[in-house]
Amino acid sequence: FMPFEEWGLPVNPIQTRVIALFVFAALMWILEVIPIWTTSVLVITLALLGTSNTSLNFLKVDKFNSADVAAIVADAYGAAADAEVVKATQSSVSESLKKATNLTPDVVRSTINTAILKPVVSGKADAAQATALKEAAGRLYEGEVSARISKLDLTNLTQQKSIFATFADPIIILFLGGFFLADAATKFRLDINLARVLLRPFGTNPKYVLLGLMSVTALFSMFMSNTATAAMMLALLTPVLALFKPEDRGRAAFALCIPIGANVGGIGTPIGTPPNAIALKFMQENGWNVTFGDWMMFGIPFVVIMLLIGWFILLKMFPIDQKTLDLAKEMKGKFMTTPKAWVVYITFIVTILLWVVPKQYHGLDANSVAIIPIAVFSVTGVITAKDLRAMSWDVLWLVAGGFALGVALGETKLANDLINSIPFAEWDSLALIVGSSLICLFMATFMSHTATAALLMPIMASVAAGMVAGGSMDAPGAIGLLVTIAFASSLGMALPISTPPNAMAYATGHVEQKGMAISGTILCLIGLALSIGLMYLLGAVGFFG
């Protein structure tokens, strides 16, 4: 339905369906005609029904032209070959190619070669027959026969197992482990009690209490859902806001500090927000390894700088008239000391330590570590079946939909064809990073951050791989590109509709949309420039290898 061939990108019917799937996902995620997680379910369903090896019968597409392959086999043997032998080889090759999951000219050539030489390998061919068969096999690698193999129209399908595996991808388990930690912390009031303790050092000066609120919110957001963190902190803040005089603009600063802290804080760890996990997934697939600890080493400094900038912006835009504010005093409670509470405390500490300490010291990667709180909290009854049902499964399904798009892009060879057809060597890597992150930031301002990352990350990962292969970008540059896009996904916070934390803050009635738009736009643009500069610096000093 589009002139792909004229653009230098010849696509087969399956690849056309994958492109249509991307367009469909983009429109549904942007317009939100249905809940965004249900769009992911539809994406996975349509990929199974229309692009996989288990497609509906009327949608099935031949992976290769049987007549062309049969003719190549016959020409390799030559006119003097036994017709029955040729026919048997043609049948064997056809069956083998139908089962192949990664169909390329080299795979076709190797399959025919194996079938032709089978009598030689098994010892059933005499000397004369062996010589003739070796000559036939040799034709596959030179001359007209070899050229015809290279020009075969081959179609690769997505594999059913690969699509279903997105529901239990290691990154999904990593996120699920984060959910278990967050739910356990909330259930045993670890979050509220930690907030009370952490806010004490900030004293009673409203300016520093504001910074304390942003910092504590950001800290919780690194390990909990941004939305859940914002809901908890705004609930704690509501009675405090009532202490402000109606004309005190500082109320807006306190209301806005929560979504800023939640949105920015999630950037600090791989489990802080889904875009981070999605970026990590595609980096791992391409062999660009960034560990949990590595991410925190550049993510947390970025968060700290952004919090200080956000704090400065809020103080300048919304001066605080209130002279004193003892927020810690308003937060009642104490740490629970029940056996299950101690299980939560110890598991929380052990899990975070294992995530932060490099893998070579204990042998577990971040995904494997995530199973520890899942197992411990399940066995000890900290998390019950009721708690499990209440978890944010919609977020996991949304992320799985993004992974399914990546599977379709890779297994149908659309990503490979994209890489081979576009002159990436001529592209400027800095222009690509700036342009793609601006597009991402714009999209994230108006649609779900996770949906934005799920849509852009598979495409940009393929582009990055192409540029690395073309020599116009190195692996650290590719990592920087994906990390910048992940950061940009979380920085879209200029409007009430940008994120649930923004909507919650706006719903308090203490924030005007104009004030949110101005402060959010300034902060997100500064954050984008800072993230690009940070990735450039890390690449220059060899942080990514």
Language-model features: locations:
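Transmembrane alpha-helix interface/packing and boundary motifs in multi-pass membrane proteins
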Residues: 27-34, 216-226, 259-271, 354-358, ...
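Hydrophobic alpha-helical transmembrane segments in multi-pass integral membrane proteins
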Residues: 268, 274, 350-356, 402-420, ...
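Structural signature of hydrophobic alpha-helical transmembrane segments
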Residues: 9-20, 167-177, 226-230, 301-305, ...
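Generic alpha-helical transmembrane segments of integral inner-membrane proteins
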Residues: 23-26, 45, 176, 180, ...
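Membrane-embedded alpha-helical segments and adjacent helix-loop junctions characteristic
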Residues: 7, 38, 42-120, 124, ...
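Flexible hinge motifs at transmembrane-helix junctions and intramembrane kinks/re-entrant loops
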Residues: 10-12, 24-42, 163, 227, ...
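Juxtamembrane and boundary regions of transmembrane helices in multi-pass small-molecule transporters
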Residues: 1-3, 10, 66, 78, ...
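Hydrophobic alpha-helical transmembrane segments
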Residues: 18-19, 38-41, 172, 207-215, ...
